[in-house]
Each structure stands twice: as structure tokens, then as C-alpha cells.
């Protein structure tokens, strides 16, 4: 493992490479204030993304070494939890929505709107400010940082944060309870999210799953699909990665199964004019996607259809695309989803699965490995599911039909997700 000085050298090299790309993008005075900060880092090249990952990993190492073993452990149990709870509370009280994007608001004005004592509100904001969320101006009034301004600058990104604070975070303290009830981690009714929301159990005592929560709460359901949309602006999940992950020129018709609002399909259609795409999802989701279709020529080749993942596929197409779908389901349900596609598949049809692929320990950069493993555990937390290895995905698909022949895997540089492809062979 690196020493402090060795890690500092790593940090310096990565910071120089990262800063160079930030400068090239026109953000040389980047300080995390709204007026001089990029909204996202989608301008980074693959080298820039690599430098960013190395910079974050080195900075985290330095923090651990500087805190020491005892202090580092205490920060997980105390400091980080308090910071998260503070920003969660400010978000749920809609504080970021009440602070103007330009200018500031006094504590007295803000407290009057959200109905919290000014002195307590000030304490919360001042802690959040040290984490980069909100800040005080010279007069002591509250203004935005680039992070808190996200709620006003992008609805989908703001909805993502709200969904994670309202739903995801509640489950984190129920991991051990869930594992005691279900050591396999595959029974969603005993999962962390179900335990976190067990106060909403039905008359038979069945705890609500994440799917029950989304069905009963249209606000959270809309935020969930906004999260899928916003994910496309995260550096490791940029929609542009899809374009180089497969030879889309070889496909004339595509079914985007569970394609949410169609954000991925629209990008494919824009760049490959020969493809016609059907986006399938639940009725209210496809209605929202249909109503928000942009008025551009390529959108005419994208249509929406209500469809249940667990019902037999009726559309005959060249390819079926499952993008970040199977990781939401334990193995048995994931197999059912794949099996439902097979009746519509003809010889030569492709099955395309784009998901995080879990690597062997140490096989990729520390930053990306931590990112992927965090996603893996979050799938357990919310869905009692998981991210899978290449072999686990192959085994899952090939259990469904021996006629599905594995073609290969592609992971675009800087992408957190890989695209695996199968071809349906003749008997």
C-alpha cells in the first residue's frame, strides 16, 4: 500500500491531468460556486475520467491516513452520518428550492418559509456548507453552491437526490436486520428497503417492496424514472457510452425493454438513422415518455408501448435491449424476464444486456472498483438483487435457452456499464 508521500505524488499527478481538462473546457476558475462551475463533468475525455478516478481514490487514501484508524472508523459512524442526515433534512424541507439561484435569502426569511427556528436552521446550513452544500455570503445570508443549485438547474437531477434521500437512505441501517431474516439476500420482502418501510405493511403483514412503494406513491415513481434519466449525465453512465458499446448499424429494429422515458433510445435513434425503436415500460411511464418526445426527426422512429416485463414479448425485432434492468431483480426473476423474450426471437435475433459487470478484486482502478461494488450493494439494499460477474450473467441467460449463443462483451473507456451480446441460433 502507498505511503502518505507516495499517495501525495499520485494525487498531484492526477490533479494536474484533471485540472488540464477542466481548464480546456473553460472552467479554469472552478470553485464550486454556481457561476463558475460546470453542471456535470460530461466534457471529460476517457483520460480525464481516469485522472478524476485516480484523484478521488488518492484523496480518499490521504483522508484515511490523516484521520488515523480510530478517527476514520468514527467518521463512518458519526461524521458522515450526521452530514448525510443534515443534507437529507434540508432537502426534504425544500431549502434548496427556497434559496434563489441568483442572490441570497436571510435565515429569518428562509426559516419563516420552511417553519424551522432560525438558529437551528443556521446550525444545519453551516454544517452542510462545510460539505459543499449551500454557503453564507458576506452578509451572513444563505446562497447556493454548485451542488445545492442542482435542484434549481435540473429537475431530473434534483429528483434523483430527493429519491435517494427519501427512499434509498432509509434502508441503510437495516442491512444486518435483513441478513438475519434472509441470509441469502434474495427475498425482497425481507430486504432492507422493505424493513425500512414496514410501517406501511398491508393487512396481512406483508412488508412493501420497492415496487409496491413506487406503485403506491406517484411522486416517488416519477422521481425514480427521473433518476434513470439523470443517470445518463453521470460521467460513468453517459449515454454516449452506449453508442460505441455495440455495432448498432447491424440492427434495423430494436425493443428497449423497460426503457423508462426513452432517454437511451433517443440517443441511439439520433445517431443511427436506420434503427426503429420501441420503448416498453409500465403504462404511466410510457405515457410520460410519449408526451415528452422531442419534436426532432429522429424521435419519429421511437415509439412507446405499455408492457409488463414478466409477460411474453409480442414484438418480433432484430434485437432486444435490457439496459440496467436485470440488476434490479434476483436470479429467479431475472431469468423470467429473459425467458419472456424468447418466444418473439427468431434465428439471428440479438439479446443485448447492458449492466455493471462486477470485476475480480484489484482488476480495475480502485475508484471504479469501489463505485461498482457500491452499486452492487445498493442493489441488495433496494431490490434484494445484485450486479453480476460476466460468468453469472452468461449462466443466467444460457439457463433460459441453449440457443442463446454468447458473442462477447464490450466496456467503453470510462463506462461503468458493459454491453454483453447473445445471438439466438437456429435449432
Curated annotation (Swiss-Prot):
One of its GO terms (molecular function) is O-methyltransferase activity. InterPro entries: COMT-like, O_MeTrfase_dom, SAM-dependent_MTases_sf, WH-like_DNA-bd_sf, WH_DNA-bd_sf. S-adenosyl-L-methionine binds at residue 281. It comes from the Eukaryota. Pathway: Secondary metabolite biosynthesis. Its EC number is 2.1.1.-. The active site is at residue 327. It catalyses: (1S,4S)-4-[(4-hydroxyphenyl)methyl]-2,5-diazaspiro[bicyclo[3.2.1]octane-6,1'-cyclohexan]-4'-one + S-adenosyl-L-methionine = (1S,4S)-4-[(4-methoxyphenyl)methyl]-2,5-diazaspiro[bicyclo[3.2.1]octane-6,1'-cyclohexan]-4'-one + S-adenosyl-L-homocysteine + H(+); (1S,4S)-4-[(4-hydroxyphenyl)methyl]-2-methyl-2,5-diazaspiro[bicyclo[3.2.1]octane-6,1'-cyclohexan]-4'-one + S-adenosyl-L-methionine = (1S,4S)-4-[(4-methoxyphenyl)methyl]-2-methyl-2,5-diazaspiro[bicyclo[3.2.1]octane-6,1'-cyclohexan]-4'-one + S-adenosyl-L-homocysteine + H(+). Keywords: Methyltransferase, S-adenosyl-L-methionine, Transferase. It holds the Pfam family Methyltransf_2. One of its GO terms (biological process) is methylation. The keyword Transferase applies. O-methyltransferase; part of the gene cluster that mediates the biosynthesis of the alkaloid (-)-FR901483, a potent immunosuppressant that shows efficacy in animal models and a probable inhibitor of purine nucleotide biosynthesis by targeting phosphoribosylpyrophosphate amidotransferase (PPAT). Within the pathway, FrzF methylates the phenolic oxygen at position C4. The biosynthesis of (-)-FR901483 starts with the condensation of two L-tyrosines to yield (S,S)-dityrosyl-piperazine. Homodimer. Belongs to the class I-like SAM-binding methyltransferase superfamily. Cation-independent O-methyltransferase family. This is O-methyltransferase FrzF. It comes from Cladobotryum sp. The lineage of its organism: Eukaryota, Fungi, Dikarya, Ascomycota, Pezizomycotina.
